[in-house]
């Protein structure tokens, strides 16, 4: 479990090419963004078949292309990614950007589904920093436990677990989205605007204008 520096510049890409531990066999991350360097190191140092990784990352890790996109694709194709959990903005010291938790599991076996959670709207606002409440954490944990306990999907299309909060994606979903893990592609949080009753609104405006005229007449008598 780790919270490495977000998009660290000059992380050591020049020496990673000849890494004696072969940690970057999926590709070398860009010199200016070390996010996947930390992820690669963590995964390669866990036990085969049982190792698990939880890492906090900026959202760019979910969708940036080029070498990062290739690394992300290989991690997914190897069935290592288990969950993508979106967090609220302004949660960490030193940055106000929203972050996500990536869960990797080297023991997923035949289950290729990936859980997406949008927890970005559940938090307690603070003067300088937001915080996750106990109930917000429990919501995330319970969604993850339910995902783990459920039977893997047999269809190519994923399924909504909780409306506007969590989604169980299949590998077909991921491929359809070109391995882009941006959470809104999977969790639909769109809120429809309430339908406006035009006639009722017009009647209210007429009534308010009448009241305004009556007040104006009263004021003229003073």
Where do the model's predicted regions map?
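A conserved structural/catalytic subdomain of Rossmann-like adenosyl-cofactor enzymes
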Residues: 1-222
């Amino acid at each position: 479990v780790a919270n490495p520096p977000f998009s660290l510049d000059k992380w050591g890409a020049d020496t990673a090419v000849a890494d004696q531990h072969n940690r970057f066999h999926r590709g070398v991350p860009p010199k200016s963004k070390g996010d996947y360097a930390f992820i690669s190191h963590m995964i390669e140092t866990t036990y085969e078949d049982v190792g698990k990784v939880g890492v906090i990352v900026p959202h760019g890790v979910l969708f940036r292309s080029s070498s990062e996109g290739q690394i992300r694709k290989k991690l997914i194709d190897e069935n290592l990614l288990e969950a993508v959990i979106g967090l609220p903005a302004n949660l960490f010291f030193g940055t106000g950007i929203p972050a996500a938790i990536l869960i990797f599991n080297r023991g997923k076996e035949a289950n290729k589904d990936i859980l997406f959670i949008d927890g970005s709207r559940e938090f307690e606002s603070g003067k300088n920093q937001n915080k996750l409440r106990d109930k917000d954490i429990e919501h995330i944990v319970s969604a993850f436990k339910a995902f783990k306990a459920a039977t893997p999907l047999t269809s190519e299309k994923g399924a909504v677990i909780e409306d506007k909060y969590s989604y169980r994606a299949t590998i077909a979903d991921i491929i359809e989205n070109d391995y882009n893990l941006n959470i809104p592609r999977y969790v639909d949080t769109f809120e429809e605007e309430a339908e406006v009753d035009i006639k009722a609104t017009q009647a209210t405006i007429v009534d308010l204008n009448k009241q305004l005229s009556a007040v104006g007449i009263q004021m003229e008598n003073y």
